[in-house]
């Protein structure tokens, strides 16, 4: 029996006994083979495997999809109504907001279908079909059509996906997008046929004082009182097929929608989550965990924190800027705080010690097996990481500063083409490139960009980058700053933001009226952009083949861990594909003398209220409803109104918006966060500390009905009392 088959058998055999209780981001298509369905039933599930995932029929899988490009959403009515998180819909809410119509502050409630807002660029994606293509890939390797490392490259897999799609019965059907992906570090491969609906409209969103209550302070924290939800609707053509926005489109008649339970929950109740976890790294070695901490998290924390201070000051001073930068700030601060929490949790939870123990056990196993590949693999990973870490640190600093931090710049490649056209006096090429420049100018100076705010960001980040990266390793602009501006960063930034061709409308109009080679050569923003891209390319060249080498080493290491038959997870790392995690409603104790119960109520909202702090403002109407205890049928038997609850489910980024389901597959909540103490969970799952923070569906319905006046939406839903 070859090693790959032995490894795959080990995966199946380990499934029942290997993963700790509640740990696991399980592949739907392997539930029966790996016996995970049996474990779910032992914990309380009352459904069969085909109720969750049925390749030949309709199942719960068909009510769950990808919301936008990085979240999960679920269908909660036969009319294509989507429930997801407020923070998942935040970009769309911000997109529709203005000082005159401030939906971020005031909320948005569509009182009828014709009031639902088209949201250009927003899509909802269902998984139509999943196929195992491992044998196809392995045959290509055996035939030497590709190398082993090429087998899990996006170049090969995208080409293979297109090839298989061309032979599929789904070819020619509207909205189908094929995707082939590696699993278990390239030991398994699956093909996903996705159905993408591009007409998604905004239906409901509470005010940010509900949807983001607690803000940055409460993010990743428990106890939680955030009403983190928003609602959208899928529209389709008259045949129910995907179609770009049209006034004639109609709400999608969905194959499946989730029933909603308001029966309540108690400690120990079964809870499962279906969704699209984005990325985990559960199989890292000690050296790789250290690299994550020092080369990725640490510089990200420092650079984002500095930028966010600038943005926050500007946002507090202007409602216009607050709306412009709301989504940018939220996206930045989310993983800024995550990085802080991850580094702290790695230390507090002794993740390095746990990984070292695993490596020691693996070394013993490899020696007993007399397997040279296994005996050497960790040392080879460590050698590679010693080379990648300093480069990765530079890459993080570069991308966080110049690509994720400072927005202004110039399309130097377009400028080069225009310069060449001017030199050759090629009128058609000049006209074509100026047309592109006009598009770029409008793209830079879009409604969510403030040139003066970005100027302040640049003045803060350019000197910070110089502190973090030694001379000789920085982009070439630092030589210019030193020589031509005598090290004065503010003077350099002002020159770029005042005099560059794309800096403002007057400069741009003057240039396109009479473009010259000299103006392009002197343009500071063009020089700046070229320098940052040159440095990016230089670092990629330094990294060279090291990522491919590490990928192959990981394939060996993970195969060996499977064969070792240790209590290791038998599920692959998350890669934004559909997964299922099961567990229970459960409290936790993060440290001696501290005990957190498993749910919160609206009492905590009033306890946290602070009218002087934007993060803890309570809307007057909500406060009135709470004080009057006007909760309707959604209250607990004792009269309290539940807000959030904890479960032991295994989630990560991408699961935001995922449905939390009870033993009958009924919706009881919407997952939206993890707890602070377990932020090392992407690297190592800790059963005692890992908790998923969920929004109670009863609070969603209460806000929708009592505050939003959206009884018509509730009437669409199937409510189980």
UniProtKB/Swiss-Prot annotation:
Marked site positions, Critical for substrate specificity of DPP7: 674
Active site: 87 (charge relay system), 228 (charge relay system), 656 (charge relay system)
Signal sequence range: 1-21
SUPFAM superfamilies referenced in this protein's UniProt entry, alphabetically: Trypsin-like serine proteases (SSF50494)
UniProt xrefs under InterPro entries: Pep_S46, Peptidase_S1_PA, Peptidase_S1_PA_chymotrypsin
Protein keywords: Aminopeptidase, Hydrolase, Protease, Serine protease, Signal
One GO MF term: dipeptidyl-peptidase activity
GO biological process: peptide catabolic process; proteolysis
EC number: 3.4.14.-
PANTHER family: PERIPLASMIC PEPTIDASE SUBFAMILY S1B
Protein family: Belongs to the peptidase S46 family.
Function per UniProt: Catalyzes the removal of dipeptides from the N-terminus of oligopeptides. Most potently cleaves the synthetic substrate Met-Leu-methylcoumaryl-7-amide (Met-Leu-MCA), followed by Leu-Arg-, and to a much lesser extent Lys-Ala-, Leu-Asp-, Leu-Glu-, Leu-Lys, and Val-Arg-MCA, while this enzyme does not hydrolyze Gly-Arg-, Gly-Gly-, Lys-Lys-, or Gly-Pro-MCA.
Name this polypeptide is given: Dipeptidyl-peptidase 7
């Amino acid at each position: 029996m070859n090693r790959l088959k032995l490894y795959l058998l080990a995966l199946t055999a380990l499934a029942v006994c290997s993963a700790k209780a509640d740990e696991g981001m399980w592949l739907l298509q392997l539930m029966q083979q790996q016996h995970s369905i049996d474990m779910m039933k032992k914990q309380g599930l009352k459904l069969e495997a085909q109720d969750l995932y049925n390749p030949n029929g309709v199942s719960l899988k068909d009510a769950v999809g990808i919301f936008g490009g990085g979240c999960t959403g679920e269908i909660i009515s036969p009319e294509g109504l989507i429930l997801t998180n407020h923070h998942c819909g935040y970009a769309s809410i911000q997109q529709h907001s203005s000082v005159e119509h401030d939906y971020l502050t005031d909320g948005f409630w569509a009182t009828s279908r014709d009031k639902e807002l088209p949201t250009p660029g927003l899509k909802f994606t269902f998984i139509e079909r999943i196929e195992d293509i491992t044998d196809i890939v392995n045959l290509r390797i055996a035939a030497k059509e590709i190398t082993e490392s090429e087998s899990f490259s996006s170049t090969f897999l995208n080409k293979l996906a297109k090839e298989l799609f061309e032979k599929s019965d789904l070819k020619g059907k509207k909205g189908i997008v094929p995707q082939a992906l590696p699993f278990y570090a390239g030991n398994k491969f699956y093909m996903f046929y996705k159905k993408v609906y591009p007409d998604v409209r905004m239906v409901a969103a509470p005010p940010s004082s509900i949807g983001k209550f607690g803000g940055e302070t409460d993010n990743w924290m428990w106890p939680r009182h955030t009403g983190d939800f928003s609602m959208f609707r899928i529209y389709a053509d008259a045949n129910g097929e995907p179609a770009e926005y049209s006034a004639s489109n109609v709400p999608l008649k969905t194959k499946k929608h989730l029933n909603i339970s308001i029966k309540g929950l108690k400690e120990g109740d079964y809870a499962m989550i279906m969704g699209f976890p984005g990325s985990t790294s559960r199989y890292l070695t000690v050296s790789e965990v250290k690299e994550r901490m020092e080369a990725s998290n640490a510089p990200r924390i420092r650079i984002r924190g500095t930028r966010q201070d600038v943005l926050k000051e500007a946002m507090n001073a202007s409602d216009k800027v607050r709306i412009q930068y709301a989504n940018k700030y939220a996206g930045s601060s989310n993983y800024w705080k995550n990085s802080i929490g991850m580094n702290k949790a790695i230390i507090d939870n002794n993740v390095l010690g746990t990984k070292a123990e695993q490596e020691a056990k693996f070394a013993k196993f490899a020696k007993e097996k007399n397997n040279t590949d296994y005996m050497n693999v960790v040392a080879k990973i460590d050698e590679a990481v010693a080379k990648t870490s300093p480069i990765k640190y530079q890459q993080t600093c570069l991308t966080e500063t110049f690509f994720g931090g400072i927005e202004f710049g110039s399309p130097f490649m377009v400028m080069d083409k225009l310069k060449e056209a001017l030199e050759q006096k090629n009128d058609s090429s000049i006209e074509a490139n100026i047309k592109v420049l006009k598009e770029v100018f409008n793209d830079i100076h879009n409604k969510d960009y403030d040139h003066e705010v970005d100027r302040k960001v640049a003045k803060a980040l350019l000197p910070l980058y110089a502190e973090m990266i030694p001379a000789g390793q920085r982009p070439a602009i630092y030589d210019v700053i030193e020589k031509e501006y005598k090290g004065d960063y503010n003077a350099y930034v002002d020159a770029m933001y005042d005099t560059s061709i794309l800096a403002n409308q007057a400069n741009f109009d003057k240039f396109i009226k009479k473009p010259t080679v000299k103006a392009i050569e002197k343009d500071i923003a063009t020089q700046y952009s070229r320098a940052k891209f040159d440095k990016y390319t230089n670092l990629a060249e330094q990294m060279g083949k090291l990522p491919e080498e590490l990928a192959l080493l990981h394939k060996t290491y993970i195969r060996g861990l499977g064969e070792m038959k240790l209590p290791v997870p038998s599920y692959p790392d998350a890669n934004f594909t559909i997964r299922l995690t099961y567990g229970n409603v459960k409290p936790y104790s993060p440290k001696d003398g501290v005990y957190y119960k498993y749910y919160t109520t609206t009492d905590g909202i009033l306890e946290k209220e602070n009218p002087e702090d934007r993060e803890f403002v309570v809307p007057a109407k909500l406060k009135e409803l709470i004080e009057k205890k006007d909760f309707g049928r959604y209250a607990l038997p004792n009269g309290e109104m539940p807000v959030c609850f904890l479960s032991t489910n295994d989630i990560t980024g991408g699961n935001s918006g995922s449905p939390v389901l009870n033993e009958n597959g009924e919706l009881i909540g919407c997952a939206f966060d993890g707890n602070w103490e377990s932020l090392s969970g992407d690297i190592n799952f800790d059963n005692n500390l890992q908790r998923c923070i969920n929004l109670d569906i009863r609070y969603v319905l209460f806000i929708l009905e009592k505050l939003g006046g959206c009884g018509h939406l509730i009437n669409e839903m199937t409510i189980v009392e």
